[in-house]
Amino acid sequence: MKIPSATILGTLLAAATAMAAVDPGLLNLVMPEAKILSGVQVAQSQASPFGQYLLSQMQINDEGFQKFVAATGFDPRHDLNEILAATNGDHRALVVGQGVFQVDRILAAAAAEGAAVTNYRGIDIVTSPDKPGSTGSIALLDASTAVMGDTDAVKAAIDRRIAGTSFSGSLADKAKEVSAVNDAWFATVTPLSDFLNGKVANPNLNGMTQGNLLQAVLQASGGVKFGSAGVTISGEAVTRSDKDAQSLVDVMKFLASLVQMNKDKDPLAAKAASLADAAKFTADGPVMHLTMSLPEQQIEQLFMPLAPKPRRTGVALR
């Protein structure tokens, strides 16, 4: 039986979309009280033109990097597939990754560098030797899954893995939705003012986070898609009302205009202005949308180092 080419194409596109979504196994490892999730489809991103550009900028000849790869057998350029990070908003974060890990080799390399290796429920936990009393740890749950965070967070993730718990709810649903159409993404269903309260060191900025506008943002999400011809950035903020969404659009447009007004002051401001110029803000009911498309050449230029300022020669005027 001959299958129509349109059916084959549709199936491939659907499969590609499904593959792009956050891995359920990684999602189930995050803490149940997580407030913000973010992730990167590393393998997909690296395959894009921009991903190849970033790889070309890596210092692969660095002695420390080569020593790390030789000792562990792990090369992040092609052994890392996906990263998922979660935080509960209380200075506790957990990072989980999917890739190819040579467990015994990595553990041996860590021990050789002085790291403490302890066993918890059949899984070895490696604790950093950098500082006395350090609580930064990493555990390899199997040859394809890694967990990193403070020791208690890593142990809790191991507990969830063994218990077979699942992460569900509105944040999980939003994460699946956003990650399915982006290579790098974030999602939160917590009001921004709640999450930022007391987290900003500057008292003036901390006060701004509690302003009426940010209090109106009930949840937010966004992402970056690396395409064959450039990069697309998108985001949305769900507010309390249609009026709040439009007010947020107006504020974002005003801030973008301020950035553009200062573009001639220094090269960094000029780079920011190019982003502001490409940004489009719209309101659809209580939701504010951001879209931004940048061609490959422009996005690469944004990541190029700034040229050093010319030095004064010290020649006196006559």
Enumerate the predicted regions with their spans.
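Structural boundary/hinge residues at secondary-structure and domain interfaces
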Residues: 20-133, 174-213, 250-278, 300-318
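Short cationic amphipathic helices and targeting signals
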Residues: 36-38, 91-99, 144-149, 233-237, ...
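Bacterial N-terminal signal peptides
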Residues: 7-16
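A short, solvent-exposed beta-edge/loop patch
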Residues: 134-161, 227-230, 280-299
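A conserved glycine-rich beta-strand in the N-terminal activation segment of trypsin-fold
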Residues: 135-196
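Short, solvent-exposed coil/turn segments at beta-strand boundaries
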Residues: 90-92, 101, 120-123, 139-146, ...
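Intrinsically disordered, low-complexity segments enriched in Gly and acidic/Ser/Thr residues
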Residues: 215-283
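Positively charged n-region of N-terminal signal peptides that target proteins for export
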Residues: 1-6
